[in-house]
């Protein structure tokens, strides 16, 4: 069993979402010393946006892929291989303009791919990533959970569900830009929520 850990904030050591995802990983590894962790830093090392060559390759019948088209999918293949190899996902995603950072949107575009993470049949679309768990930790300047301006959680739930991931947990650290007291309360609340998710995953995951 493997854990896939993604950060998408470009803020480096100042990032709250990074510190929160790291807390989860540290707690998880304390209980599962031998569980490998795949780490990808989308904030510092963003994946490229998909382009015309990528689209042509992704929808080309596999038997007709040329070396050039195969090359266009190399990064996508690598990212999807990481997804398939892991059973548990921890994603740190700050809210930017009521949604996700561009780095995470580019990541989603690379991994949502026909015949790899979903298939199309006479019955419609079917996601291929079964029996996975994902924890999404978001950081937000204000309070948006359940509000019309929250285009982040509904979007991510829809995308993850489309590729087959339905066991999705969100922890929202909100009001981080309101004031120091609100900020500290939000971080402390997120720490408690992370500890609870670790306990829940521990009780429901066979290692």
Curated annotation (Swiss-Prot):
It catalyses: 2 a quinone + NADH + H(+) = 2 a 1,4-benzosemiquinone + NAD(+); N,N-dimethyl-1,4-phenylenediamine + anthranilate + 2 NAD(+) = 2-(4-dimethylaminophenyl)diazenylbenzoate + 2 NADH + 2 H(+). Its EC number is 1.6.5.-, 1.7.1.17. It holds the Pfam family Flavodoxin_2. FMN binds at residues 9, 15-17, 139-142. One of its GO terms (molecular function) is FMN binding. Signal peptide: none annotated. Binds 1 FMN per subunit. Keywords: Flavoprotein, FMN, NAD, Oxidoreductase, Plasmid. It comes from the Bacteria. Its cofactor is FMN. Homodimer. Quinone reductase that provides resistance to thiol-specific stress caused by electrophilic quinones. Belongs to the azoreductase type 1 family. This is FMN-dependent NADH:quinone oxidoreductase 1. It comes from Trichormus variabilis (strain ATCC 29413 / PCC 7937).
């Amino acid at each position: 069993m493997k854990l896939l850990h993604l950060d998408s904030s470009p803020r480096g050591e100042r990032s709250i979402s990074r510190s929160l995802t790291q807390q989860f990983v540290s707690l998880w590894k304390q209980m599962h010393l031998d569980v490998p962790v795949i780490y990808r830093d989308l904030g510092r090392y963003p994946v490229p946006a998909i382009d015309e060559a990528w689209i042509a390759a992704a929808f080309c019948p596999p038997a007709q892929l040329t070396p050039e088209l195969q090359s266009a999918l190399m990064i996508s293949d690598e990212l999807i291989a990481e997804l398939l190899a892991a059973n548990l996902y921890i994603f740190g995603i700050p809210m930017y303009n009521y949604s996700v950072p561009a780095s995470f949107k580019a990541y989603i575009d690379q991994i949502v791919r026909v015949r790899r993470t979903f298939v199309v049949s006479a019955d419609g679309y079917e996601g291929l990533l079964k029996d996975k768990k994902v924890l999404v930790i978001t950081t937000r300047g204000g309070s948006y959970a359940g509000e019309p301006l929250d285009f982040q959680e509904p979007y991510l739930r829809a995308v993850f569900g489309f590729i087959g991931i339905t066991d999705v947990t969100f922890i929202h650290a909100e009001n981080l830009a309101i004031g120091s007291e609100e900020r500290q309360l939000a971080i402390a609340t997120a720490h408690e929520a992370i500890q609870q998710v670790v306990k829940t995953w521990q009780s429901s995951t066979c290692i």
